[in-house]
From Swiss-Prot:
Cofactor note as given: Binds 2 magnesium ions per tetramer.
Name of the protein in question: Phenylalanine--tRNA ligase beta subunit
EC number(s) recorded for this UniProt protein: 6.1.1.20
Pfam families the UniProt entry points to: B3_4 (PF03483), B5 (PF03484), FDX-ACB (PF03147), tRNA_bind (PF01588), tRNA_synthFbeta (PF17759)
Subunit (UniProt): Tetramer of two alpha and two beta subunits.
Length: 798
C-alpha cells in the first residue's frame, strides 16, 4: 500500500514528523517497507533561464542554448522541441545526480559541441510521466533558485498490509490507526447526500437465485449527465503519480482515487453505451468480455458480472469492460457502487488470472456499510471536477449483516498479551478504532465497526488493545526454565542402549541392515518358511523376512573383505522374525568378527578370530544388559550355522538366551565369504529383568588391604564333562573368599585312563578382614574338592 505524507494528512490532523510516522506505523503492525523522498535527490537542480536557442550546427533536431544558471552562462545542447529563448527551466549542472538514470551528470560533447549541463523533463526527475519536452517553470521565478526552494515535495510511504487489514488498503484506515496510537486526530469524513435533479433512466437489478444471493447483496448507482471528462486537477494527478498510477482522465482518476483513499473501488460506465437497466448476475458459460486491459475473457457460470441487455459489461469487483468504458467524448456516466462476495471475487480472479486494485480489495472484504456513502462522495467529486447534474440514486438489495457483539474480559489482555492495561485505556483504544463500547457484567461489550470484518472474537479485541497500546510496552520476560525431563525410555530401550555402547566399546562397528534377505540365505539360517515370504518385496532378491541377523552381518563382512577390509567387527541390534504373527519377533544383539583378532607384531604372533572372541563379546553384552554372566550355563551345542565343535549356547536354566562360536565353514563357502568368521546372537528379551533400577548408585567399592593368594587344583574327569561345570562348582564352594576361578590346563593323553581327562584350575582367594591361616586355606580347598566331586564326579589328582 502506497500513499504520500500530504495525502495522509488530509485525513490525519498531526504535527508528527515523517520519522515519527514511520516509527508509529511499524509499531502498530503496518510495517514500513520504504520511503521515497524526492527531495533527497533534487538538491542540485536550479532554475535556469534560456537566453538563446539556436540550431545545432551539425544536427537538425538539436538546439544549442545559452542558459543562465544564476552563477554564470552555460552552453547546453538540448533536443527538446519546446526549448526556446525566454523559458525558465530546471537546470542540472555537472556533478548533479539524475534520478531517472541514477547517473551523475558530466560535461560532454554532443555532435562535436560541448554541453555543460542538462535541462530536464518531469519524467527525468521522477516527478511525473511527461517527457515530451523539458519542464516549463513560472517565468517569475528567480534564476539560480534551488528547486527545493520553489517546489514542495511530498514523500511517498509504502507499507506492508496483512490480508486481514483490508481497511488499511485505504489512506483513511491508516490515519485512523495512527490517531488511535496517539499521532494526531482523525479528521471527520462528511457524507452529504447529493439531491437528485431527475430520475435515472437506467435502473439496477439483482438477478440471482436465492442460493446465490450473497454474490452481490447490495448494488447502488446513479446517472450523471452533462459531464466533461477532461484532465484531472494537478493535486489529483500528483497523488496518483506518486503511488505509481498513471492519470488517465478525471472520471477514471476519481474511481482510482477512491480505491486508495477510502478503500472503496467504484466503476463508471459510459451511459450512452449501456442498453437498458444494469443488472448484477452470474455469467453464463461461453459469454465473453473484452476488458479495459485489452484482453478478452471467456466466462464460466458462477462468475459474477455486471451486465446490460446485450451482455456482460464488467467483471464484478475485478475489471471493467472496454465497450462501456469512458473516453474524452463521454458526457453521461452511470456510477456504480456495490458489495461483492469476497470468495467469488477471489475465485474468478484466480480463474481468469486477473489481479487488479479492485479485486485486491473486494476479495479481502471491503466495508459493507459504506456502499451508499461512497457513492454520494464520488458523486460530489464528479460534479465538482467534471460538472453536470446527478439523478436520484437507484439501489437494489440490502446491506449485508455485519453487526457483531463481543464481550471483552479485561483480565484476558494480561493473560494473552502479558501486559497490564487499564479498562479505561482499553475502552479509549477501542473507541478510537471505531468500536462501540459499553459496560458489561464481565467487562466490556464491544461492537466492532463495519470496516473491521477481521474482528470476530475476544482474542481479536485483545490483539487490538495490545497493538495500539504498543508492543514495546510488553515487558521482556525470559522463557521459563524447563524442569529436568523424566526418563521416557522403557527398561528394554535402556537395556538396548547399554548393550549398544558396550559392543561399540569393544571395537565393533554398529550397522543397520535390511529386515529381509534372499530366500536361499534364510534357509541356511533356519528360515525361509512360506508364511515369511513378502507379498510385495522391494527387490526380487530381498523376498523373505530374516530368521537371524547374522546373514546380513556375514555378507557385509564379505563385501568389506573384497574391498580390502579383511579384519573387522560388526554388530546390530534389531529384530529377527520367527513367525508372521505378533509376538513372534525377538530383539537380538548380534555381532561378528572376521579375519585376525590380533595383527602382526614383533612380540606376539598374529591370531585369527575364534569362538572365544565371540564368547567374550556375548558375555560382555550380558553384563552390560544388567544380567550376571555367572548365572548362565555354557553348553557345547549350537544351531547348524555354527561350527559344531567351536560353538556354544548360553542357557538360563533350560532356556537358551544366546549362541556364539565360529560360523560354519561350509556356510561361509556358500556365501562366498572367506573365513574365519566368529559370531554371536544374544536374545535381550530372554535375559532376566534387573532387580534394581538402572539409576541406582553402585555400592561403594571396598578394596581389601589383604593380599590375595592363588591355589591350583587338577581334577580327573570324564571326557564329557564341560570345563564350565567345574568352574561353576569351584566358584560356588565359598562365595565370600573365592573371587575368581580360571582354567589353565587341559590334558588328554596316554597317561590318562580311557574316557578320562585332566582339567586344572586356579582359584583366587581374597580375604577381607584377616590374613588366612593354613587351616583356613585347607578348609576352603576341601570345600572346592567336595563341590567339584559332587557336581561332576571329578577326583583330585595326586
Amino acid at each position: 500500500m502506497k500513499f504520500t505524507l500530504d495525502w495522509l494528512k488530509s485525513h490525519l490532523d498531526t504535527d508528527a514528523t515523517l520519522e515519527q510516522i514511520e516509527v508509529g506505523l511499524t509499531a502498530i503492525g503496518l510495517e514500513v517497507e520504504g520511503i521515497d523522498d524526492p527531495s533527497k535527490h533534487l538538491g542540485g537542480f536550479v532554475v535556469g533561464h534560456i537566453l538563446e536557442a539556436e540550431k545545432h550546427p551539425d544536427a537538425d533536431k538539436l538546439k544549442l542554448c545559452k542558459v543562465d544558471s544564476g552563477a554564470g552562462i552555460l552552453q547546453v545542447v538540448c533536443g527538446a522541441p519546446n526549448a526556446r529563448a525566454g523559458l525558465k527551466v530546471i537546470l542540472a549542472q555537472p556533478g548533479t545526480y539524475i534520478p531517472i538514470t541514477g547517473d551523475v551528470l558530466k560535461k560532454g560533447k554532443v555532435r562535436g559541441v560541448e554541453s555543460q549541463g542538462m535541462m530536464c523533463s518531469w519524467r527525468e526527475l521522477k516527478l511525473g510521466e511527461d517527457h515530451d519536452g523539458i519542464a516549463e517553470l513560472d517565468v517569475t521565478l528567480a534564476v539560480g533558485a534551488s528547486l527545493l526552494d520553489i517546489m514542495s515535495f511530498d514523500p511517498m510511504i509504502e507499507i506492508s498490509v496483512t490480508p486481514n487489514r483490508v481497511d488499511c488498503l485505504g489512506v483513511r484506515g491508516i490515519a485512523r490507526d495512527l490517531a488511535a496510537f496517539g499521532l494526531g486526530n482523525l479528521k471527520p469524513l462528511k457524507v452529504e447526500p447529493v439531491p437528485g435533479a431527475f430520475k435515472s433512466s437506467i435502473g439496477v437489478r439483482l438477478e440471482f437465485a436465492p442460493e446465490d444471493s450473497n454474490a452481490c447483496p447490495l448494488f447502488a448507482g446513479r446517472l450523471i449527465r452533462g459531464v466533461k471528462n477532461g484532465d484531472s486537477p494537478q493535486w489529483l494527478k500528483d497523488r496518483l503519480t506518486a503511488i505509481g498510477l498513471r492519470p488517465i482522465s478525471a472520471l477514471v482518476d476519481i474511481t482510482n482515487f477512491f480505491a486508495y483513499d477510502l478503500c472503496r473501488p467504484l466503476h463508471v460506465f459510459d451511459a450512452a453505451k449501456v442498453k437498458g437497466d444494469i443488472r448484477a448476475r452470474l455469467a453464463r458459460d461461453g459469454e465473453t468480455l473484452a476488458g479495459l486491459n485489452g484482453k478478452t475473457y471467456t466466462l464460466e457460470s458462477g462468475m459474477t458480472v455486471i451486465a446490460d441487455e446485450n451482455g456482460p459489461e464488467a467483471l464484478a469487483g475485478i475489471l471493467g469492460g472496454e465497450h462501456s468504458g469512458c473516453t474524452e467524448a463521454t458526457t453521461e456516466v452511470f456510477l456504480e457502487a456495490a458489495y461483492f462476495d469476497p470468495i467469488r471475487t477471489a475465485a474468478t480472479g484466480r480463474k481468469l488470472d486477473i489481479l487488479s486494485d479492485a479485486r485486491f480489495r473486494f476479495e479481502r472484504g471491503v466495508d459493507p456499510a459504506f456502499v451508499v456513502p461512497s457513492m454520494e462522495l464520488a458523486t460530489r467529486m464528479i460534479l465538482d471536477l467534471c460538472g453536470g447534474e446527478a439523478s436520484e440514486a437507484v439501489i437494489a438489495g440490502t446491506e449485508p449483516d455485519w453487526q457483531k457483539s463481543i464481550v471483552l474480559r479485561p483480565n484476558r489482555v494480561a493473560e494473552l498479551g502479558g501486559v497490564e492495561v487499564s479498562t479505561q485505556r482499553m475502552e479509549t483504544i477501542l473507541n478510537d478504532l471505531g468500536c462501540a463500547v459499553a459496560e458489561h457484567a464481565d467487562g466490556l461489550l464491544v461492537n466492532p465497526p463495519s470496516w473491521r470484518g477481521d474482528i470476530t472474537a475476544e482474542h481479536d479485541l485483545v490483539e487490538e488493545v495490545i497493538r495500539i497500546n504498543g508492543y514495546d510496552n510488553i515487558p521482556a520476560t525470559p522463557m521459563p526454565r524447563p524442569a529436568m525431563p523424566k526418563p521416557v525410555l522403557t527398561p528394554g530401550q535402556r537395556r538396548s542402549g547399554w548393550v549398544r555402547r558396550q559392543l561399540a566399546t569393544r571395537g565393533l562397528v554398529e550397522t543397520v541392515t535390511w529386515s529381509f534377505l534372499p530366500e536361499a540365505q534364510a534357509v541356511m539360517f533356519g528360515g525361509g518358511a512360506p508364511e515369511m515370504h513378502l507379498a510385495n518385496p522391494i527387490s526380487s532378491d530381498l523376498d523373505v523376512m530374516r530368521p537371524s541377523v547374522l546373514p546380513n552381518l556375514v555378507t557385509a563382512a564379505g563385501r568389506n573383505a573384497d574391498r580390502g577390509m579383511k579384519d573387522l567387527g560388526l554388530f546390530e541390534l534389531g529384530p529377527q522374525f520367527d513367525g508372521p504373527e505378533p509376538g513372534q519377533q525377538r530383539l537380538v544383539a548380534a555381532g561378528i568378527r572376521a579375519g585376525r583378532a590380533r595383527g602382526r607384531h614383533w612380540a606376539d604372533p598374529a591370531r585369527a578370530v575364534d569362538a572365544f572372541d565371540a564368547k567374550a563379546d556375548i558375555l560382555s553384552a550380558v553384563a552390560a544388559a544388567g544380567a550376571n554372566p555367572d548365572s548362565l550355563q555354557v553348553v557345547a551345542e549350537a544351531p547348524v550355522w555354527y561350527h559344531p565343535g567351536r560353538s556354544g549356547t548360553l542357557k538360563l536354566g533350560n532356556k537358551p538366551v544366546g549362541f556364539f562360536g565360529e560360523i560354519h565353514p561350509g556356510l561361509l563357502a556358500k556365501l562366498d565369504v572367506k573365513g574365519p568368521v566368529a559370531g554371536f546372537e544374544l536374545f535381550l528379551e530372554a535375559l532376566p529383568a534387573q532387580k534394581a533400577k538402572a539409576t541406582k548408585a553402585k555400592p561403594l567399592l571396598k578394596a581389601s588391604a589383604l593380599q590375595p593368594l592363588d591355589r591350583d587344583f587338577a581334577f580327573t574327569l570324564d571326557t564329557g564333562v564341560a570345563a564350565d561345570a567345574v568352574v561353576r562348582a569351584a566358584r560356588n564352594a565359598d562365595k565370600v573368599l573365592i573371587s575368581d576361578v580360571a582354567v589353565f590346563d587341559l590334558y588328554e593323553g596316554d597317561k590318562m585312563a580311557a574316557g578320562k581327562k585332566s582339567l586344572a584350575i586356579t582359584v583366587t582367594l581374597q580375604p577381607t578382614d584377616k590374613t588366612l591361616t593354613d587351616e583356613d586355606i585347607e578348609a576352603v580347598g576341601a570345600k572346592i574338592v567336595a563341590a567339584v566331586a559332587k557336581a561332576t564326579g571329578g577326583e583330585l589328582r595326586g
